[in-house]
Curated annotation (Swiss-Prot):
Location of this chain's protein in the cell: Secreted
Keywords: Disulfide bond, Growth factor, Secreted, Signal
Proregion residues excised on maturation: 119-153
Source species: Panthera tigris altaica
GO BP, one annotated term: cell population proliferation
Entry keyword annotation includes Disulfide bond: yes
Protein name: Insulin-like growth factor 1
Annotated region described as C, given as residue ranges: 78-89
Disordered: region residues: 120-153
Top-level taxon in the UniProt lineage: Eukaryota
Record PANTHER family: INSULIN-LIKE GROWTH FACTOR I
Function: The insulin-like growth factors, isolated from plasma, are structurally and functionally related to insulin but have a much higher growth-promoting activity. May be a physiological regulator of [1-14C]-2-deoxy-D-glucose (2DG) transport and glycogen synthesis in osteoblasts. Stimulates glucose transport in bone-derived osteoblastic (PyMS) cells and is effective at much lower concentrations than insulin, not only regarding glycogen and DNA synthesis but also with regard to enhancing glucose uptake. May play a role in synapse maturation.
């Protein structure tokens, strides 16, 4: 049974090889060169690891990854296992001179800032109004009460 199931496979391989031979004779050497160059490019880019980022490309990548949080060029304190490391490495050392990945870039993002709680307008009026009313009352009182005149400000 093994020979019967492999017969269609062998026929396909043979026909495919014949098809390629005919196509190769039709293609010019320059076309073959460009086809080979494309194949090399696609295979090498598929196996390539993280790339290096320097200068404006590094800044653009950090802005994209970190967004509104911002980023640091040196690691903030608290990263790493020991604070006694003599040479402090930065993002340029890690991503420009060597290749780095997305996780490495995210390590240099600033932490999220907690949202500021806005004071309500009602709370501002409550705290500001008595002081203003008190000042007006004091000004009226300082003018005296001669003639029982009411002064308005």
């Amino acid at each position: 049974m093994g020979k019967i199931s492999s017969l269609p496979t062998q026929l396909f391989k043979c026909c495919f090889c014949d098809f390629l031979k005919v196509k190769m004779h039709i293609m010019s050497p320059s076309h073959l060169f460009y086809l080979g160059l494309c194949l090399l490019t696609f295979t090498s880019s598929a196996t390539a690891g993280p790339e290096t980022l320097c200068g404006a490309e590094l800044v653009d990548a950090l802005q994209f990854v970190c967004g509104d949080r911002g980023f640091y060029f040196n690691k903030p304190t608290g990263y790493g296992s020991s604070s006694r490391r003599a040479p402090q490495t930065g993002i340029v050392d890690e991503c420009c001179f060597r290749s780095c990945d997305l996780r490495r870039l995210e390590m240099y993002c600033a932490p999220l800032k907690p949202a500021k709680s806005a004071r309500s307008v009602r709370a501002q009026r409550h705290t500001d109004m008595p002081k203003a009313q008190k000042e007006v009352h004091l000004k009226n009182a300082s003018r005296g009460s001669a003639g029982n005149k009411n002064y308005r400000m």
